[in-house]
Amino acid sequence: MQNNHLQLEQLACQRGDKILFTDLNLDAKSGDFVQIEGHNGIGKTSLLRIIVGLSFPAKGKVRWNKIEINKNREEYQHNLLYLGHLAGIKPELSAWENLQFYQKIGNCRQSEELLWDILQKVGLLGREDLPAGQLSAGQQKRIALARLWLSNAALWILDEPFTAIDKQGVNVLTQLFEQHVENGGIVILTSHQEIPSNKLQKVRLDQYKFFDQGNMA
């Protein structure tokens, strides 16, 4: 995997008249594993949406390999895997069909044998043919997380990936994240849980809180 570099420069986020955070700088390079921390409402999800290009910052820039992401969107999206709060799966399709669909549209490894291996890893063997809409919220979350094992993307942006996942699942995912960064990837995530990794760097959004109210003009 080539060396990559994500830069957040003087980012500020505003929701209505409230400024959630300001003057946030972050350099994440190949091999970095970053956890965004902060209390509810501080703007963790908003920050991730800015990083992936789904929202715009009140000020500041996001760069991928020194180029602003809005000027290099196709290459950036090719290198990006984003998993948000919602599972983002098709409920009418089975777990197997959802993963096959993702293989077709994403930057993914193509292997039927790999699909079986992933279904076993996420505990869905025996349920692979059931419509995803008939599965529990935790099982639907596992379908979404299964994309991680398929993805060739360098940059993983994950919003609360451990929600509805048991302790064993947390350990399995953490090992996967560590393997990804060891291979030159970048992982940025939010989580309220303690993550069992000594590779983790933590960023507290509270440090960038803007206490006065007003516009960023």
From Swiss-Prot:
Disulfide cysteine pairs (residue numbers): none
Chain ranges of the ABC transporter domain: 6-216
UniProt cross-references to NCBIfam families, sorted A to Z: ccmA, PRK13538.1
Organism of origin: Histophilus somni (strain 129Pt) (Haemophilus somnus)
GO terms classed as biological process: cytochrome complex assembly
Any Pfam family matching the protein: ABC_tran
E.C. numbers: 7.6.2.5
Topology of the protein relative to the lipid bilayer: Peripheral membrane protein
Descriptive protein name: Cytochrome c biogenesis ATP-binding export protein CcmA
Record gene name: ccmA
Function: Part of the ABC transporter complex CcmAB involved in the biogenesis of c-type cytochromes; once thought to export heme, this seems not to be the case, but its exact role is uncertain. Responsible for energy coupling to the transport system.
Keywords (A to Z) from UniProt: ATP-binding, Cell inner membrane, Cell membrane, Cytochrome c-type biogenesis, Membrane, Nucleotide-binding, Translocase, Transport
Family note: Belongs to the ABC transporter superfamily. CcmA exporter (TC 3.A.1.107) family.
Broad class of where this protein is predominantly found: membrane
